[in-house]
């Protein structure tokens, strides 16, 4: 995995980061998304203190991430249960078809 030095504009500041080449566009998209979220939060709350706005945006993003992790865990459990049931059914079929 080769890295590329990339300049990203985030909240009006240029950040220079070493990024895997295949992730450059995703990082740029994430930076644009962060700018939008901060602008929307400033507009919504009327706050002008960047640190407070960033704290709220970070908390919202953290909450969304937690929700997605919980959803993923539930889906994984459903899939695991389904696979176990299929394995059990296949084993029953195999045992039933074995000559005695």
From Swiss-Prot:
Query: Which cellular compartments is it found in?
Result: Cytoplasm
Gene Ontology biological process terms in this record: division septum assembly; FtsZ-dependent cytokinesis; septin ring assembly
Q: Which residues form a coiled coil?
A: 21-45
The domain of life for this entry's organism is Bacteria
* Keyword Coiled coil found: yes
**Stored InterPro entries:** Cell_div_ZapA-like, Cell_div_ZapA-like_sf, Cell_div_ZapA_N
The Gene Ontology CC terms held by the record are: cell division site; cell septum; cytosol
Which UniProt keyword terms apply here?
A: Cell cycle, Cell division, Coiled coil, Cytoplasm, Septation
Task: Write down the Gene3D superfamilies for this protein, in alphabetical order.
Answer: Cell division protein ZapA protomer, N-terminal domain
Subunit structure and binding partners: Homodimer. Interacts with FtsZ.
Q: Which family does it belong to?
A: Belongs to the ZapA family. Type 1 subfamily.
Q: What does this protein do?
A: Activator of cell division through the inhibition of FtsZ GTPase activity, therefore promoting FtsZ assembly into bundles of protofilaments necessary for the formation of the division Z ring. It is recruited early at mid-cell but it is not essential for cell division.
What's the name of the protein?
Answer: Cell division protein ZapA
Species this chain originates from: Haemophilus influenzae (strain ATCC 51907 / DSM 11121 / KW20 / Rd)
């Amino acid at each position: 995995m080769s890295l590329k030095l990339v300049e990203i504009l985030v909240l009006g500041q240029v950040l220079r980061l070493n990024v895997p080449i295949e992730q450059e566009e995703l990082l740029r998209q994430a930076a644009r998304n962060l700018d939008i979220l901060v602008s929307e939060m400033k507009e919504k709350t009327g706050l002008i203190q960047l640190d407070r706005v960033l704290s709220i945006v970070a908390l919202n993003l953290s909450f969304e991430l937690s929700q997605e992790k919980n959803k993923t865990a539930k889906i994984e459990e459903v899939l695991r249960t389904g696979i176990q049931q299929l394995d059990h059914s296949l084993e029953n079929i195999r045992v039933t078809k074995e000559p005695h």
